[in-house]
A protein has these predicted regions:
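Short S/T/G/P-rich N-terminal loop/turn motif that feeds into the first structured element of a domain
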Residues: 1-51, 55-69, 76-94
Length: 94
């Protein structure tokens, strides 16, 4: 069964969020090659939620190492970041 990681991010400014989103759009497919789905939603002027779907828990755990390195090295840092992990129980993509 697929595993999802949901990241919640809060930035100091809308500009920081936009810069980070542009960088993530360019780099995420290469950073997380095992991801089946990479999705980012801007939930407010300075906040975003990203959802990554992996084929299994092992792939999700392996990506966490890359995620943590990426977060530490990123030029634009979120003010606050946390994540949840769970089993995907329903998926529909049209």
């Amino acid at each position: 069964m697929s595993t999802a990681r949901i990241n919640m991010l809060e930035f100091d400014s809308e500009e920081d969020l936009n810069q980070r989103a542009e960088m993530y759009q360019r780099e995420a497919p290469e950073l997380f090659p095992n991801a089946e789905i990479l999705l980012t939603i801007k939930t407010g002027p300075t906040s975003a939620m990203s959802v990554s779907i992996y084929p299994d828990e092992k792939s999700a755990e392996e990506s966490l190492i890359r995620r943590n390195k990426h977060f530490k090295a990123a030029e634009v840092q979120p003010r606050e970041a946390w994540y949840l992990v769970g089993e995907v129980v329903q998926r529909h993509v049209k």
